[in-house]
Curated annotation (Swiss-Prot):
Subunit structure: Homooctamer.
Source organism of this protein record: Thermococcus kodakarensis (strain ATCC BAA-918 / JCM 12380 / KOD1)
Gene assigned in the entry: fba
Enzyme Commission number: 4.1.2.13
GO cellular component: chromosome; cytoplasm
Major subcellular site: cytoplasm
Protein name in the entry: Fructose-bisphosphate aldolase class 1
Length: 281
């Protein structure tokens, strides 16, 4: 990688990370990966223009979308909103045992034409199709880096052997392994699971060897403070922020949660105090 490429990567990463080195990124790939039923709690958010307009107005640092959603709603982004385009995905229409592969659904040059600041792809470490996703990621990373664009790996350990040996995919040992694998395959940013404690997540951050690690937001919590506490622990563990979908778009008014997350991530505010300040409790 020459100096021009590395400068391009660093500059584009700053589209997501503030001066504190942290980011709050809104995830909008659920309609494809989980299906439109994910939007049933607040049905108007099935319209990407509506929800993206809301989250951008509330102040998220970046938005992650699939290429088609960018075409539908990309003009809702502000000039300073980071755009992450994900180039792999899968549906939940296939049998569960066949959902251990994310296929490539676009190319780096397509994402760049759409205005991407970063390119993302998923690898299910431990899947029987791990080698396919590893090759996809390697090709995406090589091409993106050649053009000076950062790559983000959604490093998700999952597969029958993981379940058999560790009991769950969130076991810190496999999450740590996935984060290290992401770093060693060239990721500039890593999105991964919560491991259940600040102490174990700190080991995940250490294993990533300096590559920023962001929390995968997961399912919506009934109590917003519970989620804010997890994000607080991620930050305390040295994590670089969170990529959040359902804990935002499954709320009638997502703005208070976004602003509370900003308080926790960027201002180091106590989760309960942040929730009170934004009227969540």
């Amino acid at each position: 990688m020459d100096a021009y490429q590395s400068v391009g990567i660093r500059r584009r990463l700053k589209r997501f990370f503030r001066r504190d080195g942290r980011a709050l990124i809104f995830a909008m790939d659920h309609g494809f990966e989980h299906g439109p039923t994910d939007f049933e709690p607040v049905w108007e958010h099935v319209n990407p223009r509506i929800i993206i307009r809301k989250v951008v107005r509330a102040g998220v640092d970046g938005v992650m979308m699939l290429p088609g959603i960018v075409r539908m709603a990309g003009d809702e982004l502000k000039p300073d909103t980071g755009l992450m385009i994900k180039l792999t995905s899968k549906t939940e229409l296939r049998p569960k045992e066949e959902q251990l592969l994310q296929s490539q659904l676009g190319y780096v040059e397509d994402a760049i034409k759409l205005g991407a600041d970063a390119i993302a792809a998923t690898v299910y470490w431990g899947s029987p199709q791990e080698d396919v996703m590893m090759r996809q990621f390697a090709e995406i990373a090589s091409y993106a880096h050649d053009l000076g664009f950062p790559v983000v790996q959604f490093a998700y350990p999952r597969g029958p052997y993981i379940n058999e040996k560790y009991g769950k995919k969130e076991d810190y040992r496999v999450v740590m392994y996935g984060a290290r694998a992401a770093a060693e395959t060239g990721a500039d940013m890593i999105k991964t699971y919560w491991t259940g404690s600040k102490e174990t997540f700190a080991k995940v951050v250490d294993a990533a060897a300096g590559v920023p690690v962001l929390l995968s937001g997961g399912a919506k919590t009934d109590n917003p403070v519970d989620f804010l506490k997890v994000v607080w622990d991620v930050i305390e563990a040295g994590g670089a922020g969170a990529v959040v979908g359902r804990n935002i778009f499954q709320r009638e008014n997502p703005e208070p949660m976004i602003k509370a997350l900003i308080r926790v991530i960027h201002r180091n505010e106590d989760p309960e105090e942040a929730a009170k300040a934004e009227g969540l409790i």
